[in-house]
């Protein structure tokens, strides 16, 4: 990625201050980002026992703002498909993440899969926020007004906040590079 690059030319450090091997700073940086991603994933709030499945949350939002057909389905067939796709992708990531976390407990270190999870997870977070805004129509992008609910106002703020998830913890472009080299074994 051509942005957010920092180069230290002719930098001098004492040997005892060196982290990792000499001239292997990127390897140390990648490992740090890997642990940061792992910590971010673990710090997310756990699902409550009585929490509605995401499908119900998306569907109820869509029905509230867009209406429903005679069979109780979301009126807009395209958005209905988008809701199902988002929910299936989120569920697939959740199941795969659970499996890999269980496997990594035996190895003691996060594997290269965390780069995939960060990239896919952040993309799904971003697309989920975008979908929620689309489902709310014009109410999905309000900033302040007494005519809108606190939930509608927070939805807009969440959508804006979630735009950053593909950047922090290592941009998606950095993740793609790591995946290409470490997971797929592609050459530089």
Q: Predicted regions span which residues?
A:
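Glycine-rich beta->alpha junctions and the first turn(s) of the following alpha-helix
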Residues: 1-92, 165, 181
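Secondary-structure capping and boundary motifs in well-ordered enzyme cores
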Residues: 21, 75, 85-92, 109, ...
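Charged/polar, solvent-exposed surface patches and flexible loops
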Residues: 31, 60, 64, 102, ...
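Short, charged/polar low-complexity linear motifs in solvent-exposed/disordered segments
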Residues: 45-47, 121, 131, 186
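C-terminal helix-coil-helix/basic helical segment that borders enzyme active sites and/or dimer interfaces
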Residues: 67-70, 74, 80, 91-147
């Amino acid at each position: 990625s051509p942005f957010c690059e920092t180069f230290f030319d002719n930098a001098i450090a004492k040997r005892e201050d060196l982290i990792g091997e000499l001239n292997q700073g990127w390897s140390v940086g990648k490992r740090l980002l890997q642990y940061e991603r792992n910590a971010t994933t673990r710090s997310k709030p756990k699902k409550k026992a009585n929490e509605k499945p995401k499908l119900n949350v998306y569907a109820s939002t869509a029905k509230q703002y867009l209406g429903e057909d005679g069979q109780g389905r979301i009126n807009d067939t395209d958005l209905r498909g988008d809701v199902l796709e988002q929910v299936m992708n989120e569920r697939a990531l959740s199941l795969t993440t659970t499996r890999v976390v269980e496997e990594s407990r035996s190895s003691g270190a996060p594997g290269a899969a965390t780069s995939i999870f960060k990239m896919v997870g952040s993309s799904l977070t971003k697309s989920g926020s975008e979908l929620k805004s689309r489902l709310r129509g014009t109410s999905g992008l309000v900033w302040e007004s007494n005519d809108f609910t606190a939930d509608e106002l927070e939805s807009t703020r969440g959508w804006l906040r979630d735009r950053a998830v593909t950047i922090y913890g290592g941009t998606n472009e950095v993740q793609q590079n790591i995946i290409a080299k470490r997971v797929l074994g592609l050459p530089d």
